[in-house]
Amino acid sequence: MSDCLGGYDFYDEAHEQMVDEPRFVDRGKVTADTFANAGARVLEINSKTGLYPLYVTYSIFRSRCATCYEEELDDAKLQQLWDAAVGENVFVICKTPMAKQITRRTLAGFRKIQVNAHYFEDLINMMKNKPRQFVDRVLKPRYWNQEGVKTMKFDAVVGNPPYQVMDGGSKASATPVYNYFVEQAKELKPAYVSMIIPARWYSGGRGLDAFRESMLHDHRIRQLFDYSDSNDCFAGVDIAGGICYFLWDENHNGSCEVVNFHNGARYETLRQLDDNKVFVRYGQALSILNKVQQQTTEFYDSKVSSQKPFGLRTYVVPTEDGDIQLRYNKGIGPFKRELVTGALDWIDKWKVIMSYLTYDHAGRADKDGKRRIFSTMEVLPPKVVCTETYIVVDSFDSEIEANNLLQYLKTKFVRFLVAQVTTTQHISKANFTLVPIQDFSKAWTDAELYKKYGLTDEEIAFIESMIKPMG
């Protein structure tokens, strides 16, 4: 929270060791409006243990103390100032009664003082299906027992919302919900919003397309802190695609400071989040992508198949006999041509296929900070089709062209481009938005591609630092 709003931080600047005396982090106006403001109102949505409210309370408590003479600050006065911060500055929404009780205990111990904490019986459902009701209730002063207050105006809304809920499918699949919390936080019309959420929204999909567009085109997002490996933010926690937190400022209308944390390094760029047709995660990649785009008229997202290229679900298996063959997740076997319902013109061509799942666990790099991206890739000869376990990258009349495409996909150059728009464990045509189509009558190497697009030594080194070799 100190990165976005400032306040009193109990860790050193690297956030590796706790310090004996909390250090004050001053982020300028945002800090002056919130944690250094004894009249500020800060709302946390989805408190679990009261850690965020405790941070807020302590920071504002210290600001209240700063207005007093040192000789005034005896134990009674300090207790009074603490209770005032809890009762007047901090407001909390919880998802369960237990979370509410824990939060209250964190802020007040066993003392009976005013703690502005409520829980919603079905918070996620209300955020998703009754957003207006949520906003209206939270903005009513009487909901918080705020006597003499005409309108509840929050200076900041903060939180670590729930990330997903199981969607009840036949397999253990989940639907994201954190987007609803971000949207309703904005609807409360605070001066600032700061939340920590999964970064997979960068790529959209799974109900996140509208949220992605809203975030990328919202020029009130002043800062975005991005961790490609969630372990660098939450030790021991694997979140596919990484994690991010942001600062939304109602009075900001301009570029966003994007801060990437990758492999122990920090890199900052100032840019519009919607500068490109897709959100480019790493600022260091922008110059590379610009060079590629200047020389390219057609990209591979126009060629790659949709999911289920031949209309065959994952559970489809070979038949006892058939006039063609089926590649499925356990191998290959006979299949009947008449059972194929999609891409009939590809059946008799050479095809390059790949698994729809990425190789990297939860999108994480290895210990050296490098990713492989693609897992299974192979060339299917004519009269061989596949289930939806695979996607078809392209089809050709000749084996040579298919083999050359396969080698092209194995280059670090291509996998680097795909990595820029891959924040989930699934590969689809959208992940090939930045990959240029080549002449596949010849083979391509990384050295040739680097030369073709005029990459500098620094740009080449960045690609090599992120992508591992693939034989």
Kindly give the residue locations of the regions a language model identified.
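C-terminal substrate-recognition regions of SAM-dependent nucleic acid methyltransferases
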Residues: 152, 230-457
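SAM-dependent methyltransferase catalytic region
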Residues: 1-223, 229-233, 242, 246, ...
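Short, amphipathic C-terminal "tail helix"
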Residues: 461-471
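Charged interaction patches that mediate protein-protein contacts
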Residues: 215, 455-460
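A structural signal for short hydrophobic/aromatic patches embedded in well-ordered alpha helices
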Residues: 1, 103, 405, 463-464
